[in-house]
Amino acid sequence: MTINIKTDSPIITTGSQLDAITTETVKQSGEIKKTEDTRHEAQAIKSSEASLSRSQVPELIKPSQGINVALLSKSQGDLNGTLSILLLLLELARKAREMGLQQRDIENKATITAQKEQVAEMVSGAKLMIAMAVVSGIMAATSTVASAFSIAKEVKIVKQEQILNSNIAGREQLIDTKMQQMSNIGDKAVSREDIGRIWKPEQVADQNKLALLDKEFRMTDSKANAFNAATQPLGQMANSAIQVHQGYSQAEVKEKEVNASIAANEKQKAEEAMNYNDNFMKDVLRLIEQYVSSHTHAMKAAFGVV
């Protein structure tokens, strides 16, 4: 028996071939059925998992009343007003910080100026000490020079006196020798005055010179003492004036030191105020962030947004 099966191209089959084709078709249909069953099972598992996950997510409670636009607008206005106040506080804190920076710069300059003035006064005091030493040296040198001149003059006078005394003593010795000779020869009628009458003019002249030299010596010594007595008070007055000025300079140094300490304290206060303003700005920013975050969560909860 022959069966003709039409496909895309005409094929002539026998009975055995037909049985083989039928068996193959049955196998393929069984496999297709198994595949469809597996797909249905997978879809069922996915749907069960999806339903299980939906059952685990908590459902939000639906609002019992509708959205009030007026309240929403009012809430927005309150939020804007609060944020405006907080931003104003932030701006004030920023301005205060800028003022603190300026004040710190001013106090830094004041501290530096006070320290420079203090150093200048110390230098002035050192110069005064040098001036005092110079004045003392000048007065000492002047006294030394004056004393040297006086001593030189007195030495010269002393030498002249020694020469005159030696001359006078020599003449007296000659008179004594002459008297001894006259006594030896037995001539006692000649007196000492008669013998000394020969050298009397020289003796009188030398004695007068001695008196003048002695007077000159005393005058030189008096002048030296007077000069020393005059220069010592002048030196003391100069030193006293320098010491007074030095005392004023030391007082100025102390005053500048106090000003420097005050400026340093003011600088520390300015830095503390700046730290306070920085912390205040951080607190305001954190408050703004917390307020906006809380308002956002409240709005999400009001609209049922997860």
Curated annotation (Swiss-Prot):
Protein's cellular compartments: Secreted; Host membrane
Superkingdom of this protein's organism: Bacteria
Topological relation to the membrane, as annotated: Single-pass membrane protein
Coiled coil as UniProt keyword: yes
The keyword Metal-binding is annotated on this UniProt entry: no
Membrane-crossing residue ranges in chain numbering: 128-152
Function of the protein: Component of the type III secretion system (T3SS), also called injectisome, which is used to inject bacterial effector proteins into eukaryotic host cells. YopB/SctE and YopD/SctB are inserted into the host membrane where they form a pore and allow the translocation of effector proteins into the cytosol of target cells. Essential for YopE, YopH and YopM translocation. Not required for IL-8 production and proinflammatory signaling response in host cells.
Family membership noted in the UniProt record: Belongs to the SctB/YopD family.
Self-association state and partner proteins as the record states: The core secretion machinery of the T3SS is composed of approximately 20 different proteins, including cytoplasmic components, a base, an export apparatus and a needle. This subunit is involved in the formation of a pore, called the translocon, in host membrane. Interacts with YopB/SctE. Together with YopB/SctE, forms a multimeric integral membrane complex. The C-terminal region interacts with LcrH.
Protein name: Type 3 secretion system translocon protein SctB
